[in-house]
Design a protein with these regions (language model features):
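Mid/C-terminal beta-alpha module of Rossmann-like enzyme folds, strongest
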Residues: 412-480, 521-536
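Active-site Tyr-X1-5-Lys
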Residues: 328-359
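Conserved Rossmann-fold NAD(P)-dependent oxidoreductase catalytic core, especially the SDR/UDP-sugar
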Residues: 257, 261-265, 272-280, 284-333, ...
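A conserved pocket-lining segment of Rossmann-fold NAD(P)-dependent short-chain dehydrogenase/reductase
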Residues: 274, 377-404, 408-412, 416, ...
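N-terminal Rossmann/SDR dinucleotide-binding element
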Residues: 65, 127-261, 265-268, 275
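Amphipathic terminal alpha-helices
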Residues: 122-151, 155, 170, 193-200, ...
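A hydrophobic C-terminal alpha-helical subdomain
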Residues: 392, 457-504
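Phosphopantetheine-dependent thiolation modules in NRPS/PKS and related acyl-activating systems
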Residues: 2-158
Length: 536
């Protein structure tokens, strides 16, 4: 069973990748006796396991023992440090967070103890074990993804769109309590007259509404917008990971009959968890949304996906018609689960479901610094600003302010001829990380030392401490550097997005890159992520 902390994390009650404190047991005489059964002192690996309340005899993996992504990152870091400290620096690179979620602690402890005791062939056994686990894990994961992606819910339901009836009038929205969701809710209130039913996980309706209001507050709504919220918004108590969202048959029928449009934005965004850990919400949740979309009443589905479905693609240009059908270069749970989720939507569209797919790249805070976004890009930029380091890498960095992206998504959905299309919600003009740090330097007076990507990552690793927001993502960054380098000149085509945005009376053009970066900086200052002497 996962721990309560894990469950709260998955439900969205915890801030993504917020810091945790690991309580260390004192290594005094009594605790040493527990560790080493009477020995005067414990070896480094035993001490490490004890620090995380592990004995080394557990048959479960860290994930099974309830370690959330933050604690996994802490353990992986400390394990690598211990392995290096014991003189096996070349083996520390074998430590992979995805594998630590799978290996039994008893097996891991036996492997590291072999190193500590200088057992014959210990290094070989260590490397071979991790290579074996990686191979088995990858094969099982690929098989699971292919099976999940091939699932045809419409065929199972024997769904015929011609038999669906008209009648629903409400909009149904998932993921409204995350970062992007409140901006979608705002845009729906502004650009439509329909009532909105919002899926929220909670034990009671008043608790759900309070949680939704707190999320909406992060975008600083006007009094007029709050009035619209009070008049037109109501919550649906439910859980994306459960069949029919956990609703009673009567509640499900009521929802089916009242809704004619769905915006599916709900998902876990996490760069550390593996596919299986994200499957229930990101994949099974999409199936339940599709089950609603293919219900009694005709509905349109607007699916919020991501450009991460392309993984570490090395194609020169990625078009909106591309679907990464061969599942290429997908090696972390978020990209994998969102790819499968998208395939499920495409499967339903082949049977006649009216749907659109939107793929944002990097969603940033609004140009006024609103929202609550602590994703990898914000963490990395805060770290770079703190240390005055940048990179010469030419990878496309496409930041779309959340308010603008949400506004244009809703605007495009008003056009009936946009049904059946996919849209890359990206900036029209190319920009690199160097362009971003140049503007940050102008706004803050901070000087940035630029490194090649090959040298940039070691600089980050050498400077990053456990209290840095970036720390939990270090393993991901190190493991990804070669992939990032290989796709340096990849670009996203957003022809559909530009065409329909420009055709819509509500469509809004990209703000300047300076405005986007200033919004990011304002957010970081407002949330005390960074501090600068020069005011903006």
């Amino acid at each position: 069973m996962r721990s309560n902390m894990k469950q709260r994390y998955l439900s969205g009650d915890l801030e993504l990748l917020s810091r945790i404190e690991i309580q260390e047991t004192r290594s005094d005489e009594s605790s040493t006796k527990v560790i080493a059964e009477g020995a005067a002192s414990a070896d480094a690996f035993t001490q490490l396991f004890h620090k995380y309340q592990l004995t080394g005899s557990e048959s479960e993996s860290l994930a099974d023992l309830g370690f959330d992504s933050l604690k996994l990152a802490e353990f992986a870091h400390d394990l690598k440090e211990t392995i290096s400290g014991e003189g096996f620096d070349e083996l520390s690179s074998e430590i992979d967070l995805r594998l630590l979620q799978k290996i039994a602690m008893s097996e891991l402890f036996e492997l590291v103890q072999g190193l500590n005791q200088a057992a014959p062939q210990a290094k070989f056994r260590f490397k071979s074990a991790f290579q074996r686990i990686h191979k088995e894990f990858s094969q099982l994961e690929q098989e699971m993804m292919r099976t999940d992606a091939a699932y045809d819910l419409a065929m199972e339901l024997e769904w015929n769109p011609s038999k669906s009836s008209a009648g629903g009038k409400d909009i149904f929205l998932t993921g409204a309590t995350g970062f992007f969701g409140p901006f979608l809710l705002k845009s729906l209130l502004e650009q439509s007259n329909q009532d909105l039913q919002i899926l929220v996980r909670a034990d009671a309706e008043d608790t759900a509404m309070e949680r939704l209001r707190q999320a909406f507050e992060t975008i600083r709504p006007s009094s007029e917008l709050w009035n619209l919220f009070d008049q037109r918004v109501r919550v649906v108590l439910g859980d994306l990971s459960k069949s029919a969202f956990g609703l009673s048959p009567a509640a499900w029928r009521k929802l089916d009959e009242e809704v004619n449009c769905i915006y599916h934005n709900g998902a876990i965004v996490n760069y550390l968890l593996d596919y299986e850990s994200m499957r229930a919400i990101n994949v099974d949740g999409t199936n339940e949304v599709l089950r609603l979309a293919m219900g009694k009443v005709q509905k349109e589905l607007n699916h919020i996906s991501t450009t991460f479905i392309f993984g570490w693609s090395v194609k020169d240009t990625l078009y909106e018609t591309d679907q990464n059908a061969e599942m290429e270069r997908l090696d972390f749970g978020y990209s994998q689960s969102k790819w499968v989720s998208e395939q499920l939507v495409f499967n339903a569209m082949k049977h006649g479901l009216k749907a659109r797919v939107f793929r944002p790249a990097l969603i940033s805070p609004s140009i006024h610094g609103e929202g609550y976004n602590f994703d990898i890009s914000i963490r990395l930029l805060a770290f770079m600003l703190k240390h005055g380091i940048g990179t010469l890498a030419q990878n496309q960095v496409s930041f779309t302010p959340a308010n603008l992206g949400a506004h244009n998504i809703v605007a495009i959905c008003q056009a009936s001829d946009s049904i059946g299309l996919t849209f890359h919600v990206t900036r029209d003009q190319y920009a690199s990380m160097g362009d971003i740090t140049q503007i940050l330097g102008q706004l803050t007076g901070k000087a940035f030392q630029a490194f090649s990507l090959k040298d940039f990552v070691p600089e980050v690793v050498g400077r990053c401490q456990k209290d840095d927001l970036l720390f939990p993502l270090l393993n991901f960054l190190v493991k990804s550097v070669d992939n990032i380098s290989s796709m340096e000149f990849k670009l996203y085509s957003n022809a559909n997005y530009r065409k329909f945005r420009q055709a819509s009376p509500q469509g809004v053009e990209d703000p300047s890159l300076s405005e986007v970066v200033q919004g990011i900086l304002t957010f970081m200052l407002n949330h005390h992520i960074v501090s600068i002497e020069k005011k903006i």
